[in-house]
Swiss-Prot record:
Gene: fapR
InterPro entries documented for this protein: HotDog_dom_sf (IPR029069), Thioestr_dom (IPR006683), Transcription_factor_FapR (IPR017275), WH-like_DNA-bd_sf (IPR036388), WH_DNA-bd_sf (IPR036390)
Cross-referenced HAMAP family: Transcrip_fact_FapR (MF_01814)
Originating organism: Caldanaerobacter subterraneus subsp. tengcongensis (strain DSM 15242 / JCM 11007 / NBRC 100824 / MB4) (Thermoanaerobacter tengcongensis)
Family to which the UniProt record says this protein belongs: Belongs to the FapR family.
GO biological process, one term: negative regulation of DNA-templated transcription
One Pfam family named in its UniProt record: 4HBT
Protein name: Transcription factor FapR
Database matches in SUPFAM superfamilies: Thioesterase/thiol ester dehydrase-isomerase, Winged helix' DNA-binding domain
GO molecular function terms attached to this record: DNA binding; DNA-binding transcription factor activity
Function in brief: Transcriptional factor involved in regulation of membrane lipid biosynthesis by repressing genes involved in fatty acid and phospholipid metabolism.
Amino acid sequence: MAVRVSKAERQRLLREKINENPFYTDDELADMFGVSVQTIRLDRMELGIPEVRERIKNVAEENYRKVKTILGAEVVGELIDLELGKRGISIFEPTEDMVFVKTKIVKGQYIYSQAESLALSLIDAPAALIGVANIKYKYPVKVGDRLVAKAEVIRQRGNKYFVWVKIKVKEKEVFRGKFILVALEEDFLKKRSDTVEVGN
């Protein structure tokens, strides 16, 4: 949207864009409208629209209530979309304490944790475990990158869920994982751990 418009029209369009996609950053909106980031911030303040972090947090809080297998607070990143047994999306922004000091590259354990917790969130059962994980780190991640993870249940066979997770930074895929998760019933928590089969 390179054409300049009046302030009133820009604010109308801004509200429309944010309603369509609440995850646009001020930088992205400034580029869309051909104005400064400060102008977008002022427009948002006048319209009473919170910043992107607050918008993401609001959407995530609604989705955390749907999760059955783990606590919402255990999901790594913000859970912005969830359809139990089908698909989900989370957003995660690594911080400085999550990197290797020498290279400033985000440690793989945090990226894996985002994928694992999103996969677990999809399962419509009281508890679940990862039985098998086939993962691939495809590109290094740095602080400031916004990781968008999309997970989908590809098929279900009995109590086993086959889940694919792809994590991207912008349009570049940085991680891919195929998981087999085993759904566990409530009585699992009462059994000894050596009586439950997870793999195969």
